[in-house]
Amino acid sequence: MSSAIMSRQRVLLNSLIKFYRQKSNFESLAEILNGKISLRVFDKFVTQYSVKHSVMIPGKSAVYDSYHQQLDAWSKRMFDPFGRSHSSKTDVDKALLEQFDFTINGIGTVNDTTIGQLNFFRWIIQNNIHGIIESQYSDVRKFIDNYKPRRKRKATMKGKK
């Protein structure tokens, strides 16, 4: 891993530590990670539901546009609700996350996470997207349960001809 990438990760982690040191932010993270709303719902909300229903962040931009701005700025690995890099964590990732656990230990601990997941949920907390999802939860849930990707619909239609 290049030193520029490691440096970027360290800068990101330092900003995450600063953000989550605030008790209210850390409590919001714990509520999100331990709450009734699944990570899949967060992902589908920002990538699909918010587009179809033109959901806005109050006083800011569209949820979907903001999400893509973050992806452009960070990459999927550094902005991921699922924390998918677990199986391939590098020594740098492990060391950085140990630093995170150590730093916020006075407030609490977050286990089994990644820098990308912490970054994604910082964006969720800063923009009160968790509150938006909660206020529209039944509609979001229905949308997700009934959602069928275009590829599947086209394949199904081809099979019926």
Q: Where do the model's predicted regions map?
A:
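Long, compositionally biased non-globular segments that serve regulatory/targeting/scaffolding roles
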Residues: 1-98, 115
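Intrinsically disordered, low-complexity regulatory segments in eukaryotic proteins
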Residues: 100, 105-115
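Long, highly charged low-complexity segments enriched in Glu/Asp and Lys/Arg with interspersed Ser/Thr
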Residues: 126-155
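Alpha-helical bundle/repeat cores within regulatory domains of eukaryotic proteins
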Residues: 103, 117, 123, 143-146
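Amphipathic alpha-helical interface elements that mediate macromolecular binding in regulatory proteins
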Residues: 77, 118-123, 127, 131
